[in-house]
């Protein structure tokens, strides 16, 4: 297996070949490492960071990503995407994330064409080759590059190099689109999205940074890391009251704990194979 130094060298060589790039930037550790390395290798004038603002991510996440890109010294621009204008996304179909990523990559390609970039870069890593990843198909169709994935970076590699480079978010908890909180086939609205976002914000304020509130109409199913379930029990009453005030009739705690991609358990083998 290649060492971290070897993987870093592969990443540097790939960046040098591209000369000028546009980076899809979310503020997460993966895209932060891509942006930092691009800036170090190519210089500020040859790198543009793009942050998407949409209904599926919080305003707080957008603002933090914009600020972080600026702190890193990047030329950064925000772009607004109306994901709910696409019926596949609005109806949360099993392939909805393909259409969401397709919309984003299309916007990124337009921006890259305008600034003369040789490529659009994202933060996908080797771990992203597993599970159900419709975003991989959208990326391939758009011609975007995942240099971390190409250089065999796993999450442990990303965190190690990010820490080595002094990136403040090297151990940041991963986040993802709020659509992942809804069962496939659930119609996404501004109201139920806001309901879930408010519930998760409240739970994070209690000291649970890794949390998911899965939406099942009038039922909120809370997922936490199994090691934190015991800590959570002292907050039962206040959490129940707060989430009921947000519109949930029943508030439940999933004893199976947190697991990313949980909603994909309902997909058939044929559906999973669509984007394999």
Curated annotation (Swiss-Prot):
Enzyme class name: lyase
EC code: 4.4.1.37
Modification type 2,3-didehydroalanine (Cys): residues: 176
Description of the deletion phenotype: Deletion of this gene leads to a loss of lactate racemase activity.
SUPFAM superfamilies assigned: Adenine nucleotide alpha hydrolases-like
Induction: Induced by L-lactate and repressed by D-lactate. Is thus regulated by the L-lactate/D-lactate ratio. Makes part of the lar operon (larABCDE).
MF (Gene Ontology): ATP binding; lyase activity; sulfurtransferase activity
Catalytic activity: pyridinium-3,5-dicarboxylate mononucleotide + [LarE protein]-L-cysteine + ATP = [LarE protein]-dehydroalanine + pyridinium-3-carboxylate-5-thiocarboxylate mononucleotide + AMP + diphosphate + H(+); [LarE protein]-L-cysteine + pyridinium-3-carboxylate-5-thiocarboxylate mononucleotide + ATP = pyridinium-3,5-bisthiocarboxylate mononucleotide + [LarE protein]-dehydroalanine + AMP + diphosphate + H(+)
Lyase listed as a keyword: yes
Regions crossing the membrane: none
Main function: Involved in the biosynthesis of a nickel-pincer cofactor ((SCS)Ni(II) pincer complex). Catalyzes the ATP-dependent incorporation of two sulfur atoms in pyridinium-3,5-biscarboxylic acid mononucleotide (P2CMN) to yield pyridinium-3,5-bisthiocarboxylic acid mononucleotide (P2TMN). The source of sulfur is the enzyme itself: Cys-176 of LarE is the sulfur donor, thereby being converted into dehydroalanine, and is not regenerated in vivo. Thus, two molecules of LarE undergo sacrificial sulfur transfer to create one P2TMN. Binds nickel. Is required for the activation of the lactate racemase LarA.
Family under the similarity heading: Belongs to the LarE family.
Protein name: Pyridinium-3,5-bisthiocarboxylic acid mononucleotide synthase
The organism of origin for this protein: Lactiplantibacillus plantarum (strain ATCC BAA-793 / NCIMB 8826 / WCFS1)
